[in-house]
A protein has these predicted regions:
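Phosphate/NTP-binding elements of NTP-utilizing enzymes
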Residues: 2-167
Length: 167
């Protein structure tokens, strides 16, 4: 009959527990730390990755997005930074919510392409090269190069007679 309480092997004689390959990939992947740091903190992303300081109301806006609030209204005048804050949020979401499909629209085509989407493109150019190089910027779409169908920002207009239907 076997001993129910066998003497354990000395530590030097015990077999090491094999590591999974995925453990090594995670341990050696700086993007894992990047996600931990910025996934729930768009304000820190804007400050450290985009190297700019948002206004207090933009901080509140970004924090509402991070909290998962789906309906956010910003009442303000012209030129105060609504498109800028929206661009920051889209870029943050693109990098930290993979896979993600961000579809953006505006009341008119000129507002969409000349203001909002132009602002997104402007901030993509500000990204550090290690991030900017991961993106392909097109006229109406910004894609993650290696996942162009899984992660993108797309500008879409709608018809005046049916504004709820994006084209």
């Amino acid at each position: 009959m076997s001993n129910p309480n066998p003497t354990p092997l000395p530590l030097t004689a015990q077999k090491p527990v094999p590591k999974k390959i995925s453990d090594d990939l995670v341990a050696n992947n700086p993007f894992v730390e990047f996600v931990k740091l910025y996934k729930n903190n768009p304000v820190l992303f804007v400050k450290e990755v985009l190297n700019t300081n948002p206004d207090p109301w933009q901080i509140e806006f970004l924090n509402h997005i991070a909290a998962g609030n789906r309906r956010i209204s910003v009442r303000s005048g012209h030129g105060v930074g609504k498109s800028t804050a929206s661009a920051w949020a889209m870029i943050w979401y693109l990098f930290l919510r993979f896979p993600v499909k961000v579809v953006v629209t505006a009341p008119t085509s000129s507002q969409l392409y000349d203001a909002l989407f132009a602002e997104v493109k402007r901030w993509v150019k500000v990204l550090p090269p290690m991030f900017a190089d991961q993106l392909e910027v097109k006229q109406d779409r910004i894609e993650v190069k290696d996942a162009n169908n899984e992660a993108f920002i797309s500008a879409r207009t709608s018809r005046a007679e049916q504004p709820e239907a994006l084209q």
